[in-house]
Curated annotation (Swiss-Prot):
Binds 2 Mg(2+) ions per subunit. It is found in: Cytoplasm. Isopentenyl diphosphate binds at K75, R78, H107, R126. This is Probable farnesyl diphosphate synthase. PANTHER family: FARNESYL DIPHOSPHATE SYNTHASE. Disulfide bonds: none annotated. Mg(2+) 2 binds at D114, D120. (2E)-geranyl diphosphate binds at R125, K208, Q250, K267. GO terms for biological process: isoprenoid biosynthetic process. Belongs to the FPP/GGPP synthase family. SUPFAM superfamilies: Terpenoid synthases. It comes from Sinorhizobium fredii (strain NBRC 101917 / NGR234).
Length: 332
């Protein structure tokens, strides 16, 4: 993979992202991005609290641990991507909220399992003790299993046509399959202590992180626009956008693991180096990895530019990611 010949400088990157957001804001007059994101995250959290209500399921230790894993922080990036893609059409908010909640349940499942001693062996997540530390390993395994099941139950119970529900279930299942997050985690574990090419790391990141990001975007669109009924360019643009966005998120995570403190990360820093895990940051160097992430965010913006103002929320998600990178991983 060549990166050096295509790098933009920071000024170009910010200009490209800012231009997209500025056009979208000027065209819509809708909620400011920060307010929309806060409201969207709150709606999804309310849906999670409702779907994992102790009164409905009983306040068992398992249910308490499931709520702990899902309701205590997080940027809700994947759910917001779902809501942003849902804004491409007039998708009912209550459907998007539940789909976003299902995605967050699945994301929490992957985090709970990734944190286990047999996997990444981490004791902090979102600034709190990980589920296996607080509730024990056996409960943590069951939490991941149950959250996965509840995610699919949520999608199967949506107030939506059967074909839509099937498409959503298939999309989420594919994202965490052996070709998605599970396969990516297996590849991650297999690369520990090895010298590998950048392409291998990129392929692993696209599976481990990128597959669920891609599903989040596609599921938001699928709520209202069936793929076979959409303009041929729509899902192609969304797939390109999400592939770049998902990889950029993981590259940023690689950088912050090497540079940020516990308060910023919400988890133990320096874990990748301590475990001898190859990452984009360790292979490329911090500054090249940072520029790589910015280039990916710009490429994602270019992918959705033809969609015009209706993609404003997706463009604003890119701006948020770029701002986070500039804040927590400034250039040398």
């Amino acid at each position: 993979m060549q990166t050096g010949s295509t790098l933009h400088d920071d000024r170009t990157s910010v200009s490209a992202l800012g231009g997209l957001g500025a056009r979208a804001r000027g065209a819509s007059g809708r909620l400011l991005p920060e307010i929309w994101m806060q409201n969207g995250a709150k709606r999804v959290e309310q849906a999670l609290a409702r779907l994992l209500c102790a009164e409905d399921h009983g306040e068992t230790e398992l249910m308490a641990a499931m709520r702990y894993a899902t309701l205590h922080g997080g940027k809700r990036t994947r759910a917001l991507l779902c809501l942003a893609a849902g804004a491409l059409a007039d998708t009912p908010a209550h459907i998007l909220d539940d789909v976003g909640a299902a995605i967050e349940m699945m994301h929490a499942c992957t985090l709970v399992h990734d944190d286990l001693p047999a996997m990444d062996d981490d004791v902090l997540r979102r600034g709190l003790p990980t589920v296996h530390v607080k509730f024990g390993e056996a409960t943590a395994i069951l939490v991941g299993d149950a959250l996965q099941a509840h995610a699919f139950l949520t999608l199967a119970s949506l107030d939506a046509p059967g074909d839509n529900r099937i498409a959503l279930v298939r999309e989420l299942a594919q994202a965490v399959s052996a070709e998605g997050a599970a396969g990516g985690q297996a590849m991650d574990l297999s690369l520990v202590g090895k010298h590998v090419e950048l392409d291998r790391i990129v392929a692993m990141h696209r599976m481990k992180c990128g597959a669920l990001v891609r599903a989040s975007v596609r599921m938001g669109a699928l709520c209202a626009i069936a793929e076979d009924a959409a303009d041929a360019t729509l899902y192609c643009a969304l797939d390109h956008y999400s592939a770049c966005f998902g990889l950029a998120l993981q590259v940023v995570d690689d950088i912050l693991d090497a540079t940020a403190d516990t308060a910023t990360l919400g988890k133990t820093p320096g874990k990748d180096a301590a475990a001898q895990k190859p990452t984009c940051a360790s292979i490329m160097g911090l500054q090249a990895a940072r520029q790589f992430a910015l280039d990916l965010l710009c490429e994602a913006g270019e992918a959705i530019a033809p969609l015009g103002p209706r993609a404003e929320r997706l463009a604003q998600m890119l701006q948020r990611a770029s701002a986070y990178l500039f804040k927590h991983a400034p250039s040398a």
